[in-house]
Amino acid sequence: MQQNHMSLSNMIKEVKEVFFHVPALLIPTRYREIYREIDRAPKLLEQSFYTIFIKVWNITEKVTVTDVFYYSSVEDPLGLQSPRHSRWAQNTDEEQRKQARIIIQSVYKPNSFIRITSNKFTRVLITSLFVLTYFQSNGVFQSFPYFESQINGFLFKKMNNINQLEINSTNTCIIKITDLLTHQKSKELLGNSLPTNSILRWKMHSKISDIKTIFNMPEKWIYLPLGLGLENSEQIFSYRNFDICNLTKNSSNIMKIKNNRTILDPKIDKYPLVLKNKENILFFHKLPIQFFLFPYIVLRIWLAPVFVLWWSYQFNSEEKENIKNNLKNIHDIEISTIQKFVAKAITFRDIGGMESLKQELATVAFLLKQKNYSNSYPMGYLFAGPPGTGKTLMAKAMSYEAETPYLYVEGSQFRCREEGVANARVDDLFKQIQNISPCILYIDEIDSIAERREEANKQLEQLKTIGDSIEGSNINIDQKPSDTVLMQFLIYMDGYKKRNDLIIIGATNRIETLDDAIMRPGRFDRQIVFSPPFFEERKDILRIFLRNTKALVDDTTKTMMAERSIGLNGCDLRLLADNILLLSALESRNQQKTIPVINEDTFDRALERVSRIRHIISNYELAFGKYDFYRTAYHEAGIALIHTLLPECRPVYSVKLFPKPLNDRYLEIERENLKVPSSDIISTNNIDYFVQKIVGLLAGRAAESILFDFYPGQISTYLNKTYDPNIQGAYNIAHHIVEFGLLDSVTGVIHYLNSENENNIKDPFVTKINDLIQNKVTLKTNRELRKYSQAASILDFNEFWYEQDYPWQFDFIKKQYIYSNESSRNLDMEIVSILHTLFQYTYDFLKSNEQLLDHLASLVLKNKSISQKEIHLVVNSYGIKIPTKTWKAW
């Protein structure tokens, strides 16, 4: 324990001796503590201006004076959190070093004197004091009295004290005199080889009477301190007036270390007697500062520390000025006021689709421009919809047509933590609007400031219930800052003061989260929901994007592109058109055509770039197994055959052996269509529509069943690894057929259980209805399943098919109905009967036309892909038709 205490004391003592290289009083308080230990070197090196050796807890680094201020400003001055010091952190002496750091921190605390130095005059005085103290401690005034160039002598002196020199290859260098003079013809010519105007030659002749005495000493060494810039010059000892020899960087006595510092190899291993005989070591008595020009002295010595300190304080003052400016203008908001879009004029002709909306907005823009016709028009529009559907583009076109300023702000600009800042920004915004009206204000992402105030309403309801029990107490509700901003917006939009010649357009992606107060007429008179474009709109949008190209596009290709780009919004279509033009240009250049041509292959490659794909198999030939090629060919051929014959199914444009994943937006629309979410869709479509949909979805699985008739275990659940809506989609459609009563069944009359009639389940009338439903469903289900009961018990693939692909026991039965659990299971059996019937019909139809199915599958295997024209030619050659009448016909 005593030994540890002594080691800590010695460590603190060493730091104390070297800590005041820069006076602690002059270190600004904003700098953190610098716990550094200057490397124990000769005093000569310690007084050098150009180099400071800093040792931060056993870490030796070579830095300049500017680096000292850098190291003092970091948050971790000791480097304890640095990755390169992780090994040191695991040292056994870690606790001792932590204690030493705490002790040093208590001893060397930054002085608070700098806190009063807030004005520039005080900073100049302190800077001057620092410069004077620094150069006085380093003996600069002794070398340059009265700013005259007086040169210190180049002195050789013996080192008698062993503590004056510690041999360390990282900061010192000793070189044998005989090695330095090997290139000379004679050692005696050293004095004569020096230039006549060299101060070194004059000093050597004046201080050392007999030069031959030094030359004849075989083991004499010269100690050269590093850090003077000598090691970085091309001819090291020819730097300035030190013309001892021409030892260059490529010499054998010079080596490079990791941090790219050039040092001289002392070669101490070859001369072990040097460390013992200190009398044979010569070193410089003082720094040989040899400058002859006063401007050079000022620039190189005096202005260096002055610039460092001035920069540090100036940086602090500039930072304060920036903070003041930010505090002064914190309530201001940047508004881009554009009278007309001349550079990039956007008109309604540049927007495809939405003809009725464009006509209405064009009328409002005309009324803004010509006030003589009418002063009554919608004062606000709320644009809602997914991103990329043209909300901002429509607002820009409206402002250009009206020739009015277009003000664009973001809703997030009015969400601030500081109290009152957001309200000040709202006031500043509408004050600027009064000066430039009539104008159009476009608020993007308005849901960030117009969220529904549900929390405050809940608190009010709770306080109303307990308000009577609290007498004489003030009840306050803390509102969020966004609520106060919303209230201020509501007042400016339609409050006590009238809003003149200002149309506010708000855009949001989440209209369901908006507050009811901001959506009422008078604030937002019209609420318009933007959706992905339909077929005709996509065709119009692609026409606009491709109108300025020289590529040839026929009408059939345009129709095909509009049909196959389902699910893409306006931004996606613009990107699709750009990729089509790029690929067509590359193809025409490769084929040396003057005019590019846009065909189906170009569209397919462009669509692959636009589509967001989750799963891609790079090499299908390596990934596919033995039966995968045949399974894929028959699966795609069955889908192509059924979809070609049934009018309600989506047409197949091409069949490929290696199916590519669909884009995400296409799949989202497919999921929504297959779910049949509302009765509106059912009212426009009869039972035949849904029956054809189910048959088309089960066609691929039925074709695989024909191929693997004797190997039912090889049948796949789905092939498209991204998402296959076939199996789950067929179950969803059958579920809604039964749920909405499209069949001759009583089950569609009873819908989901409501919370109001939950207590009426035990009512006698409800019990009679449940019994009636149970008997009806049981009779119908048994009648439909009678012809499949034997096959279901024999074939193994039926068990594989139903248990894995139709999890009705996990999803359907969880929903609450007012009938009993037994009747709900019968409803599930009715869904099963629909799927059994339609799957069996699809299987029988493809089995009866197995020759046509084999023909299509062979073409897919041979050509890897077939087009829609080839499919129609093959199907029409066989003259096959499929009945598309009613459910009873199936």
UniProtKB/Swiss-Prot annotation:
Chloroplast is among the record's keywords: yes
The residues that hold ATP are G385, P386, P387, G388, T389, G390, K391, T392
Tell me the SUPFAM superfamilies matching this sequence: FtsH protease domain-like, P-loop containing nucleoside triphosphate hydrolases
Protein purpose? Probable ATPase of unknown function. Its presence in a non-photosynthetic plant (Epifagus virginiana) and experiments in tobacco indicate that it has an essential function which is probably not related to photosynthesis.
Protein name, UniProt field: Protein Ycf2
Leader sequence range is: none
List the PANTHER family hit by this protein, alphabetically. Answer: ATP-DEPENDENT ZINC METALLOPROTEASE YME1L1, METALLOPROTEASE M41 FTSH
InterPro entries the UniProt entry points to: AAA+_ATPase (IPR003593), ATPase_AAA_core (IPR003959), ATPase_AAA_CS (IPR003960), P-loop_NTPase (IPR027417), Peptidase_M41 (IPR000642), Peptidase_M41-like (IPR037219)
Miscellaneous information on this protein: The protein in this organism is about half the size it is in other chloroplasts.
Q: State any GO BP term from the record.
A: protein catabolic process
- Where located? Plastid, Chloroplast stroma
Organism from which the protein derives: Mesostigma viride (Green alga)
Q: Which Gene3D superfamilies match?
A: 1.10.8.60, P-loop containing nucleotide triphosphate hydrolases (3.40.50.300), Peptidase M41 (1.20.58.760)
GO molecular-function term, one example from the UniProt record: ATP binding
| Keywords tagged on the record | ATP-binding, Chloroplast, Nucleotide-binding, Plastid
A Pfam family assignment: AAA
Please state the protein's primary subcellular location: plastid
Question: Is Chloroplast one of the keywords?
Answer: yes
An example GO CC term for this entry is: chloroplast stroma
**UniProt similarity note:** Belongs to the Ycf2 family.
